Amino acid sequence: EDMKNAEKFIFMEYHAIEDEEAWHRIQKILEDRVKAGVEVRVFYDDMGSIGFVNMDFARKLESVGIKCRVFNPFSPGFNMFLNNRDHRKITVIDGKVGYTGGYNLANEYSNITHPYGMWKDTGVRMEGDAVRSLTVAFLEMWNAASNAHPDEIDMEQYLQPHPYQAKQNGYIQPYADSPLDGEQVGEEVYISMINKAEKYCWFMTPYLIITDEMAHALSLAAKRGVDVRIITPGIPDKKLIYSVTRSFYNGLVINGVRIFEWTPGFCHAKMCVVDDCMATCGTINMDYRSLYHHFENGCFMAGCDVVLDIRHDLEHTISKCRDVPDQSKAGRSA
């Protein structure tokens, strides 16, 4: 509905787009908005969309008036940045409404197909000043992806303030992470939340391949009495990565961290909630690629009612999980 009501612009940036049913529904809306005079830009990662779209996908979008750019196209020659992928997921509508989360624009994310059992993902819809941060993140990547001059002479035209009646207490702060600036923002947010936890710290992540620093922070939190839990998938999308993920279990479990595997299928959500007071949701997996190699984004929430919604979602998810220690699977590389 938000896209259908767009009046000025729609910006969409995703790691993967699949040229199938889920995307076709969105594309129909985008084409209708273009006909109504709305500026539409679509930006996707080339490697993330390999096998999902044809080589002429971007050209077809351009032919119907949708501006399209592809991030870091794959080529057979040497590319020192090949490993740096755009893993962000952002939609901005008129600068008034923004979306981010774990989902890409493909059938499995909408549970139209079920290659790995049920698919669980999460996202955040936001209004107000926070949307401006998503707009800036999108435009920076869009302009960096081309040697041409920026499409906009003045970025401020997309950053105009809009009247907004606050619906939540507290605040939300979107943030972006880049592998090129020497700052590991995603990891620093996670570790900061772990270190501030007093009662509980719960994570959901599709992969668990962490640095010694993060493993140490999780273990210390558990040892000081914090209820530390991590939810991972019960059905893997990549068996090798699943084995590596499970290899990290034992070192955490023996220090008091509880691991849960979601039995209905694959949980692709990336969330953390702490002490009913703060949470984060976005694109950042608890793995080395997300934390060090990819362009990522997330949103930090503090003092918002939605923090409790996230806790309740994690509680419901845990009710459908197997407790790894109880199943005596800690440290096994099945």
Label the predicted regions.
Residues E1-A334:
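Charged, low-complexity intrinsically disordered terminal segments
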